[in-house]
A protein has these predicted regions:
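N-terminal "first-domain core" detector
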Residues: 1-31
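Short, low-complexity, polar/charged sequence segments that are solvent-exposed and flexible
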Residues: 24, 33-35, 44-45, 72, ...
């Protein structure tokens, strides 16, 4: 699974996930949402599970991470309102350390150098 993060001209965080033929884009209206994903990864490392929410204008994404040894299950759900419920956007398993390192590198790349 390949993860890439960028910030668009409206200061929205864009996360692109590619895994084989699957290509998914997850967005957040606040570019600082990346730190919540890092915290969820840290929780998964320490407690076996972590989650965070990325808010968008039309709803919110929910990242759920479950660690089992060196494997990580990554689930991303989308909800546009209480009547529609949660829709699965992504459900994949990958190597935990590879995922953590990719996200950390992408977040560091987004940070301005001062």
């Amino acid at each position: 699974m390949k993860i890439s993060l960028s910030v668009d001209e409206l200061e929205r965080l864009i996360c692109r996930v590619e895994d084989g033929a699957a290509r998914v884009m997850v967005t957040a209206s606040d570019a600082d949402a990346a730190v919540h994903l890092i915290a969820a990864i840290d929780d998964a490392a320490q407690e076996g599970a972590g989650e965070c929410f990325w808010e968008e204008g039309g709803g919110e994404y929910r990242w759920m991470l479950r660690r089992d040894g060196d494997k990580l299950r990554v689930v991303v759900l989308w909800c546009s309102g209480t009547l529609t419920g949660w829709e699965t956007v992504l459900w994949r398993e990958c190597d935990f350390e590879t995922f953590r390192q990719q996200v950390q590198c992408e977040v560091a790349r987004l940070q301005p150098v001062s």
